[in-house]
Amino acid sequence: MSEFKRIPPEQALELRKKEGAVVVDIRDPQAFAAGHITGARHLDNHSVADFIRNADLDAPTLVVCYHGNSSQSAAAYLVGQGFSDVYSVDGGFELWRATYPAETAQGNAE
């Protein structure tokens, strides 16, 4: 894949469950702590280098922001860093939470 793909929450959930997709959340730390997709990793300018260094570049990677806009830039960045299977989740965490409230968690980034 030379570009990222935009997908709805339904397809993102399927990728998580069937292919073990990695979920990265680029929202601010307070928003992440207040609620995020279960199993998501918080990603920011301070953690992105370590994430890239330790990541499986071929693993499906889902990028989530607030509403699905900023995640597109972050997804494009990851593709540029060598990731081959990157998705931006349309509607962001807000639509995910409305669609799958049971698939959310609270707490700070690890």
Curated annotation (Swiss-Prot):
One of its GO terms (biological process) is glycerol metabolic process. Residues 17-105 form the Rhodanese domain. One of its GO terms (cellular component) is cytoplasm. The keyword Transferase applies. SMART domains: RHOD (SM00450). Keywords: Cytoplasm, Transferase. It is an enzyme of class 2 (transferase). It comes from the Bacteria. The keyword Cytoplasm applies. InterPro entries: GlpE_sulfurtransferase (IPR050229), Rhodanese-like_dom (IPR001763), Rhodanese-like_dom_sf (IPR036873), Thiosulf_sulfurTrfase (IPR023695). CDD domains: GlpE_ST (cd01444). Pfam families: Rhodanese. Its EC number is 2.8.1.1. This is Thiosulfate sulfurtransferase GlpE.
